Amino acid sequence: MSNYGLQLLYALMNRRADWACERVFAPYPDMEKALRKRNLPLYSLETFSPLSEFDVLGFTLQYELTYTNVLTMLDLGGIPLHSADRTMNDPLVIAGGPSAANPEPMSDFIDLFIIGDGEEALPAVCDFWLEMKQQYGDGRRQTADGSQKFRRQALLEAARKFPFVAAPQFYSVQYDSNGRPMRPRPNETGVPEIVQPARIDDLDTYEPPILRIVPTIECVQDRVTIEIMRGCPGRCKFCVSSVLKRPTRCRSPENIARIAKESCLATGSDEVSLLSLSTSDYPKFEELMAQLRENLTPLNVSVSVPSLRVNHQLCEVMQQLTTERTSGLTLAPEAARDEMRRRIGKPITNEHLLAGCESAFTNGFNRVKMYFMCGFPEETNDDIDGIIELAHTISRLGRKIWGKSVTVIANVSNFVPKPHTPWERLGMATQGYFLNAHDELKLRSKRTGIALKYHDLETSLLEALLCRGDRRLGRTIERAWRLGARLDSWSDYFRGDCWEEAIAETDVNVNQIVHEAVPDNAELVWEYVRF
């Protein structure tokens, strides 16, 4: 229940009298085993209804390593894995979220991808599907072949009707002389050449839920979350989120403050988190913080700001965030040197970073977490070494102000060139490069006492394969799942051996997809979706 989008769309659909929106999550392997042993279907949390009884089943694809979760849920829910095998008696299977920006790898399993904002798009697609079921019937009085034919026609009408819907089965893919997939092109008349994202103009039109779901057990990020701004004024070359969420739109400060107070009173939460890609870039930040303090201080509710830009405003922001609670500061400098930041399109300086951290320590913060990346183009040893050097400098600064050790964490991820970003044509650095970089970081962190965390390399390479691949990867995903791949984004359950075997069996050219740069004159397989 930590996903803001799920809470928002759940509340939006349930405000309507003609829809009942319920929740279901991928089960842990022990629950999956118990369901299969007892021949029970996967069911919704609200009414324990089997998934196959719903009209529409929607997945949010937040991360490529959740793809096998989709197959687990479809199979446990009694729904055919492949879109082509479903009839009008089966739910419409839709998906949205960041990973839907390249629909191709999951095109065998998803009927329709909703691209862009879901507030208006989801109800429109759901209403349309009910019309199609009324027009063509639910499949119970039809032969399987006839019902599949009607379903295909209904999906085709959706692809023609909605400019924000990607229906991969109505696009054909050809391959160039090097075996690279070209841009998919329509194979039916009336299907658009290019899919355009759905966009809402005014965030205030779609208010976050006040009476949001409160789980009976504590969950990750157990707090009231309010989206204050969608989009980002920054243009970092590696960042896919800023591309997918364009243009920048803001919620009014008075609405944010009111929603925060009402939500805390309704749920009992003692923390409010302001959600955006760069909260300190919110145009009326000082006014917003003043209104939040007025509304929340009497309730003993704290405010969390997880996404802060490192610039000249950071010192002012630290003063605005001063509360009675000692808490942590999270920053994303991405690179340790000013020169590399200019190259990646993130115009911040170490001067601003150090000044902001000094202000944070002075105003009661005793913990700083910083997010970096390694594997950027033209990266040098100085860039790698600089990560620990910068963290060590901040650690010494904190000790000077507090008179004792503060916590400084350097969290290093591996750069994956994502579709739709300015660096989408680049290849990912090799496994050997990352291993050497990680070894150097570990060595230097031990000498300085800096807490170092870095992303697992095997899962980063798999992420690159799944986000940059084409529909041929559908066989690979399914084979890995049948071999036992489950909950791949959870380190306790990740089975790299399943993926290695599946990749070998399905003859995937990993080097071409992951590591080779795509020539400027070559087409990209995700180009039929435009942002």
Task: Report residues per predicted region.
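Conserved SAM/AdoMet-binding glycine-rich loop
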Residues: L65, K261-V412
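Short helix-loop-beta junction
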Residues: L8-A20, E294-P298
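Iron-sulfur (Fe-S) cluster-binding segments and ferredoxin-like electron-carrier domains
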Residues: C239-N255
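Glycine-rich beta-alpha loop elements in corrinoid/cobalamin-binding modules
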Residues: A26-G139, G146-N187, P422-D470, E478-S491
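Flexible glycine/acidic-rich beta-alpha junction loops that bind and position SAM and/or redox cofactors
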Residues: P29-D30, P105, S172-D176, P283-K284, ...
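N-terminal [4Fe-4S]-dependent radical SAM core
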Residues: P168, Q174-T225
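N-terminal pre-triad scaffold of radical SAM enzymes
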Residues: M13, V214-K237, C264, N414-V416
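Aromatic/hydrophobic pocket-lining residues that form the small-molecule binding cavity
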Residues: V70, L122, I256, F285, ...
